[in-house]
Curated annotation (Swiss-Prot):
Reactions performed catalytically: a quinone + NADH + 5 H(+)(in) = a quinol + NAD(+) + 4 H(+)(out)
Cofactor binding mode and count: Binds 2 [4Fe-4S] clusters per subunit.
Topology with respect to the bilayer: Peripheral membrane protein
GO molecular function: 4 iron, 4 sulfur cluster binding; iron ion binding; NADH:ubiquinone reductase (non-electrogenic) activity; quinone binding
Record domain 4Fe-4S ferredoxin-type: where: 56-88, 98-127
Name of the protein this chain belongs to: NADH-quinone oxidoreductase subunit I 2
Protein encoded by which gene: nuoI2
Subunit structure: NDH-1 is composed of 14 different subunits. Subunits NuoA, H, J, K, L, M, N constitute the membrane sector of the complex.
Cofactor: [4Fe-4S] cluster
Pfam families per record: Fer4_7
Chief location of this protein within or outside the cell: membrane
HAMAP family according to UniProt: NDH1_NuoI (MF_01351)
Similarity annotation: Belongs to the complex I 23 kDa subunit family.
GO cellular component, one term: plasma membrane
Amino acid sequence: MSRALDKAGRWIGWAFFADLANGLALTFGYMFSRPVTMQYPDKEKWLPYSRYRGHHFLKRDDEGEIKCVACELCARICPCDCIEVVPYEDEKGNRRPAKFEIDTARCLFCGLCEDACPADAIALGQQYEFSSFSSRDLVIGRDDLLAKPGKAMTGGGVVAARLNTERDVLVEASEPRGYNWWRNIRRK
C-alpha cells in the first residue's frame, strides 16, 4: 500500500513540477520580450477606431441651427435614464430643446440614443478623456454638446501626443508612430 502511495506521490510531484516549469517558461518569455505599455499621455496617444463610441455631441443643420426637435425619443430609449430633454417652441413654431443634458457618469455609451433619433441630431464622438473629480462635472449641457467635435474618419493607431488647443482634439501625425501592441499579442 505504501509503495503505491509513493508512486502516486512521485507522479503528482512531477506533474506539479511540469506545470511550474511551463509557468516559469511563459514568465521568462514575457520578461525578455518587448514591453507593450504605452507612455500615455506624455509621449503617445491612442486614436480610437471610427466605430468607437465616446462622448456625445449634438449636430447642427446647414443653417447653423440645432437639428434636435426635442421629441425625447433618446431620453425614453436610454436604458440608464441619463438623458434629460425639456422642449420649447421657438418664434418660428419649431420645437427645440430648452434643456438637453446627458449625465455621462451614468451613461453606458451603448448608442441607442443615436439610433433612436429621427432627426439624426445626436451622435457619439471619439473623445475618451473626460474624467473628473466630481460627478456633477460629468453632466453635459446643450451648449457643451453643441461645441464638441465630431467623429474622425481615421483611427485605431498610436500617434505622437500633440493636441490642437483650439478644439482640444488630437492632431494626427503624418504616419502613426509607436509600438503596435495589438499585432504582437501572443495567442495560443
